[in-house]
């Protein structure tokens, strides 16, 4: 289940892994000397509301439109922190995760986008491909499984 915290106007910078791989390949093919540091981000940055729209479209599911105020989200997060402390279990919801969710996290990728690199996939296409892989496609016993937090 999903519950929107806040108005959803906070913006998030994201990158599709296929584009990151293509960018690294592009840089390796240039074979430039020296050290070059890049922040890879696919643009445009999306608001949480627009990101939910992409997810709804990709999964063909309606996400509940109920929104709770940020202060109530924090309160719930602190409640889960206390439960986690008492039970000594790590829970999926915490005050830290609420804080990250409602924050704007935007990064500057001007250097990447002025380097001549053209991403092979739009951010929306990358999100669609990722969501399909993670939540729609059938899995076999031979598929590798990666666990994250």
What are these model-predicted stretches?
Residues 2-8, 12, 97-100:
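Conserved catalytic loops of nucleotide-sugar-dependent glycosyltransferases that act on lipid-linked
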Residues 3, 13, 44, 66, ...:
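Residues that recognize and position ribonucleotide moieties
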Residues 6-28, 36:
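Substrate-positioning beta->alpha
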Residues 12-18, 46, 107, 121:
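Residue-level signal for the nucleotide or nucleotide-sugar donor/cofactor binding architecture
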Residues 17, 53, 76-117:
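Conserved C-terminal active-site "lid" loop/helix of NAD(P)H-dependent oxidoreductases
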Residues 21, 52, 113, 124-128:
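Generic structural signal for individual residues within well-ordered alpha-helical segments
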Residues 26-91, 127-131, 137-149:
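Mid/C-terminal beta-alpha module of Rossmann-like enzyme folds, strongest
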């Amino acid at each position: 289940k999903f519950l929107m915290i806040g108005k959803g106007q906070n913006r998030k910078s994201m990158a599709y892994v296929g584009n990151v791989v293509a960018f690294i390949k592009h840089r390796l093919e240039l074979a430039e000397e020296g050290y070059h540091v890049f922040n890879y981000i696919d643009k445009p940055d999306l608001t949480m509301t627009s990101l939910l729209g992409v997810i709804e479209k990709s999964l063909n599911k309606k996400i509940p439109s109920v929104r709770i105020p940020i202060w109530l989200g924090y309160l719930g997060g602190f409640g889960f922190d206390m439960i986690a402390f008492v039970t000594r279990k790590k829970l999926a919801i915490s005050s830290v995760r609420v804080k990250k969710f409602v924050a704007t996290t935007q990064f500057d990728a001007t250097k990447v986008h002025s380097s001549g690199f053209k991403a092979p996939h739009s951010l929306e296409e990358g999100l669609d491909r990722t969501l399909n892989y993670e939540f729609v496609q059938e899995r076999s016993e031979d598929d590798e499984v990666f666990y994250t937090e």
